[in-house]
Every structure is written in structure tokens, then in C-alpha cells.
């Protein structure tokens, strides 16, 4: 401490041989002493300035008087644990996915990758998403900045489709390069109850009850289409519809139980346009020549419009409570378990499809809308992140965000890092109280989610 030597300067004593640590302090104090003498002769004009100079000694140079208390350091929130639900990367279209294909004026482009599989282009996109997430998690202290994470601190689990298995493997390597983390999964093609609880028979499902509940909650497919005339017009413009007229807005809609009662049977404009819209987005994201992206008529604006048509499918199959409380329940329970268990991995990654993200989002009460996409449409390689944060006061809160590459980032395989991030959106957790939706206390979050998981009869 320099306080005694500074006091001597104030008295006018000489200070030869001062310590290096105090020399600058003494110089400032000496200057202040001379200024004080001048100030006294000038009727106090500079009192405030002298005090400021003396204050500089304390604030900048750390020469607080003995016995003083240093200001408390305000701690920033710490990210303790993360659960991520990824959608697989860019894939080739599913067999029959473009249900409105016959309305097109020209043949559809051919893909070199077999139907439903991750494309080579899509593989690179997944790697880049994973590498970015690794940088962000390292910045937050969840992953190490160098080297491998501690054993058991990272877990990756994928659904049984080949595209999700491959995406999981790519993400595991990107999140911890060279560390040998293996993305787990059940036998390829089987029904994993975590991702397909209805198909696996893990939860009760009655098609008639499902239809009744969906109709009551949403008004049905025709009601969901209300207000989307512009999106339907965009689809018609891209397809051409000169050989076969396609006035989607005038087509009838119906929703019924499937033949076996274990699913839904949807007919009408949403069924025709949702998958077709997704195929058009995949053409652009894959990097096909623009002349092959909707035959040159799928502008970015129109792609965003047909992306919304794709998302309408989830308003039938995933977001209504009857569906979400079944399709999204296993993943929701994983979130609760991993946030409650201090021994759980700090990072848990689940790799599934857009339906899983939509169902879990519905249970959480979150909505997202990223530039270039339709509202609530999960892009390829996008992810829903749920973070458990410890506040400065020790309170643990849950925060949600959505991140995904833009269509142009996917198309060009753009560089991704902390200076060149993907699209991101902080999400409000509407299952929590209004004042808690951006940072929901863990007990309130768990209680609200348990309520959401109660099955409709």
C-alpha cells in the first residue's frame, strides 16, 4: 500500500527511494498537492478537479487506504448444463414427399443422393453447425477450449433413421474433435420410444380422440389455412400449374383417424403443399443451380412463404396438445431428468427430426421465426437449445434459444464461428409466468412442464 508515502507528500515531505509500485502514485499525489496550493490562491475554482485527480489514484492505481473494502465483484450467470435437440442436416427428398409434384409444369430435378439420406453437402453443413456450437459452448465454459471434455460430460443420442444416425456421428466429432465420443442409437430403422413413442406403443393413442382434440384446439386444417392465401399463391406460382390447375385455396380439407386408428389421415392443401415446400427449400440449401430451384421461380421471398406451409403440417401432427404430450413427452422428460441430476452430462444432444422439435417446442410454449424461413419451421441442421443457468444469487433458471444456419449459409457452406454465427433467436418459454419467460426458475419450469405432460383423455 502507498497511503503512508502519499500522506508524506501531502505534508510536503521529500520521498526519495519510493517503491516502483508507488512511484506513479506519489507523482500524482505530488501534482495534486501543488494543485491544491494553487487552488487555495484561486478562490477554490479547481476543488472538484483536484478531488478527481486524487480519486484517480484510488480507482485506477489501487492505492485504497488501509482498512478500506474493495467493491464487490458482480458475477455473471454461469451455464451449468445444456440439452440440445438437433434436426438432421440437408437430405435428399423423402419418397413421395412433394405431394403436389403432379401440378408442376416441368419434371422435378434428380438428386444424386438416394431418397431420405444425408447428402455430402448436408454432411459438411452439420459439421459446421457442430463446430460453431463447440466454440459457443467453450466460450460459456461448458466445453474445454482445448483438449477433450471430461469423461461422461458429453452425450449424443440419435434417432434410428440413417440421416439422424449420420448427423449424430458428425456432431459428436465436431463437438469434441478426436475425443472418440460415439453417438448412440438403437438399431437402424427400429422404433426408438424416445423419438417414436406412439409407433413403439410406449404411450396410449386413439386416432378418433386425437382428431376430436385437434379439431377443438385448432379448428381443423381449413381453419389453419385461413390467412395463408399469399403462401398458397407463392406455391402455385413456383409450380406453374398450367397443365393441371391448382387453386389450393379452394380445395377441400379433411382430417380423420388412419385406417388402423394409430395415426392421422390428412387430405387437402396442407397435405399437398407442406412436403412440397420442404423439397423446394432443400433444393436451395443443397446448392442446386438456381434454374433447378423451383425451376428458377423460387425466389428467397417465395421460399420463406412456402416454408410456412411446411410448418402448418406440425400444427396438425405435432403442436396440438394431444400430439405434443405424446410425441414430445419422452424428450421433455429427458430435459427434466438432466436438469435435476447433478451427475448428468453437462451437454446432452438428441438428434431427431423437425417433428420432434415442433412437439417439444409446443410443450415448452416456444415459437421461433428465423429470417428466410416460415414461422415455426425447423430448418435442416437447426437446433433447440435449453440451458440451465445459475444466476449470481444462486437461483437456477432455464433459458431457451433457437439457432440454425440461414438458407444462404447452408447453400454456400459458409464459414461459421463466433464472429460469423448462424441465425439465433432467444425464445420466451410461454409455459412459465409472463415475467419469467426469458429466464424461468427451474422449480417453476419443472412444475409447468409436468402439467403440460398430462395426457388428454
For the regions a language model picked out, list residue spans one by one.
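Cationic, low-complexity basic patches in intrinsically disordered or flexible, solvent-exposed regions
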Residues: 5, 11, 15, 40
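N-terminal amphipathic/hydrophobic targeting modules at extreme N-termini
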Residues: 15-18, 26-30, 34
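Bacterial N-terminal signal peptides that target proteins for export
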Residues: 31, 35-51
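C-terminal motif of bacterial Sec signal peptides marking the signal peptidase cleavage site
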Residues: 61-62
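Bacterial lipoprotein signal-peptidase II cleavage site
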Residues: 65-69
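Signature for phosphate-centric chemistry
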Residues: 70-155, 159-348, 352-457
Amino acid at each position: 500500500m502507498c497511503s503512508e508515502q502519499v500522506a508524506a507528500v501531502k505534508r510536503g515531505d521529500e520521498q526519495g527511494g519510493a517503491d516502483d509500485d508507488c512511484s506513479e502514485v506519489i507523482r500524482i499525489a505530488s501534482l495534486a498537492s501543488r494543485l491544491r496550493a494553487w487552488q487555495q490562491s484561486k478562490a477554490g475554482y479547481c476543488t472538484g478537479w483536484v478531488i478527481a485527480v486524487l480519486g484517480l489514484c484510488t480507482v485506477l492505481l489501487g492505492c485504497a487506504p488501509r482498512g478500506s473494502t474493495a467493491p464487490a465483484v458482480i458475477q455473471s450467470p454461469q451455464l451449468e448444463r445444456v440439452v440440445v435437440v438437433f434436426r438432421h442436416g440437408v437430405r435428399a427428398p423423402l419418397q413421395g414427399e412433394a405431394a403436389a409434384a403432379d401440378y408442376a409444369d416441368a419434371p422435378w430435378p434428380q438428386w444424386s443422393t438416394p431418397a431420405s439420406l444425408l447428402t455430402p453437402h448436408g454432411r459438411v453443413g452439420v459439421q459446421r453447425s457442430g463446430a460453431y456450437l463447440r466454440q459457443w459452448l467453450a466460450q460459456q465454459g461448458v466445453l474445454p477450449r482445448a483438449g477433450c471434455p471430461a469423461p461422461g460430460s458429453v452425450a449424443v443420442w440419435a434417432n434410428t433413421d440413417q440421416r439422424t444416425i449420420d448427423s449424430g456421428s458428425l456432431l459428436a466429432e465436431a463437438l469434441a474433435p478426436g475425443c472418440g465420443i460415439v453417438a448412440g442409437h438403437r438399431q437402424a430403422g427400429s422404433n426408438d420410444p424416445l423419438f417414436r413413442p406412439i409407433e413403439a406403443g410406449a404411450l396410449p393413442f386413439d386416432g378418433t380422440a386425437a382428431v376430436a382434440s385437434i379439431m377443438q384446439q385448432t379448428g381443423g386444417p381449413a381453419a389453419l389455412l385461413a390467412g395463408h392465401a399469399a403462401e398458397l399463391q407463392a406455391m402455385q406460382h413456383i409450380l406453374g400449374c398450367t397443365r393441371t390447375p391448382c387453386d389450393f385455396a379452394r380445395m377441400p380439407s379433411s382430417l380423420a383417424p388412419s385406417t388402423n386408428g394409430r395415426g392421422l389421415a390428412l387430405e387437402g392443401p396442407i397435405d399437398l403443399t407442406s412436403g412440397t415446400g420442404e423439397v423446394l427449400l432443400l433444393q436451395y440449401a443443397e446448392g442446386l443451380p438456381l434454374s433447378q430451384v423451383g425451376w428458377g421461380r423460387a425466389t428467397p421471398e417465395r421460399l420463406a412463404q412456402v416454408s410456412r406451409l411446411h410448418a402448418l403440417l406440425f400444427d396438425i401432427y405435432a403442436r396440438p396438445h394431444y400430439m405434443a404430450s405424446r410425441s414430445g413427452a419422452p424428450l421433455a422428460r429427458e430435459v427434466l431428468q438432466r436438469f435435476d441430476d447433478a451427475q448428468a452430462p453437462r451437454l446432452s444432444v438428441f438428434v431427431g427430426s423437425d417433428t420432434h422439435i415442433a412437439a417439444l417446442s409446443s410443450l415448452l410454449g416456444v415459437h421461433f421465426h428465423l429470417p428466410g424461413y416460415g414461422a415455426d419451421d425447423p430448418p435442416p441442421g437447426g437446433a433447440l437449445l435449453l440451458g440451465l443457468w445459475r444466476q449470481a444469487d444462486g437461483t437456477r433458471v432455464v433459458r431457451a434459444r433457437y439457432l440454425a444456419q440461414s438458407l444462404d449459409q447452408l447453400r454456400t457452406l459458409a464459414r461459421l464461428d463466433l464472429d460469423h454465427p448462424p441465425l439465433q433467436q432467444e425464445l420466451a418459454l410461454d409455459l412459465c409466468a409472463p415475467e419469467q419467460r426469458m429466464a424461468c426458475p427451474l422449480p417453476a419450469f419443472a412444475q409447468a412442464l409436468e402439467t403440460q405432460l398430462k395426457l388428454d383423455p
